[in-house]
Amino acid sequence: MGQKVNPVGLRLGINRNWTSRWFPSTRTAPSNIDEDNKIRKFLKKELYYAGVSEIVIERAAKKLRVTVVAARPGLIIGKKGVDIEKVKEGLKTLIKKEVSINIKEVKRPQADAQLAAENVATQLEKRVAFRRAMKKVMQAALKSGAKGIKVRVSGRLAGAEIARTEWYMEGRVPLHTLRAKIDYGFAEAMTVYGIIGVKVWIFKGEVLQKGIQFEKKEEAKEEREPRRSRRGRQ
């Protein structure tokens, strides 16, 4: 099951939160979903240069608040906030509502699955060899503190006549473990041979009661090793 479904959707309410946060009625739900989709498409298109990882939309009464999580927030805000005001005006024209926009920075861009997927897609569009692009992103993620990463590309790789799928994995990516914090990203590369899909899974540790715990399994391993050695002496 964990291998097939979206890992973010599988963990909603466990260790992941919704990116659209509002309470719908039967009458307003369709229009709100359509509006959220328009907002995300608009921001992805307008802020492509800033490395947008996630867009969170919150509604309360007649207020609409959008939080953009990006790798380069300074490019979105601009000098004296000029650029962010242009984005606000564009959104206001699109949905005919007042919108407040918050900008958050991605703490570790190399360990963000969405940014990693877009990075691979960009390299494929520049005709970089797909294996080189995948391995480069994987090495950067592991250096940034990721516990494991899996990258999969599908399509006419290297201009092959028949589409195929190839993937690489480093470290652990426990997709069946619900307490595991798995980040997931998807992007598409528009090449001269067609569209190549890129999927990235990044394992960042296990979420327990006290938050993400990285070292617990390593400590348990160190405790078990002396027991084995004692049995070996017997």
From Swiss-Prot:
Annotated protein name in UniProt: Small ribosomal subunit protein uS3
Stored SUPFAM superfamilies: Prokaryotic type KH domain (KH-domain type II) (SSF54814), Ribosomal protein S3 C-terminal domain (SSF54821)
Gene Ontology BP annotations: translation
The organism's place on the tree of life at top rank: Bacteria
Residue stretches making up the KH type-2 domain: 39-107
UniProt family annotation: Belongs to the universal ribosomal protein uS3 family.
Quaternary data: Part of the 30S ribosomal subunit. Forms a tight complex with proteins S10 and S14.
SMART domains: KH
Any Gene Ontology CC annotation: cytosolic small ribosomal subunit
NCBIfam families recorded: rpsC_bact
Keyword line: Ribonucleoprotein, Ribosomal protein, RNA-binding, rRNA-binding
A GO MF label: rRNA binding
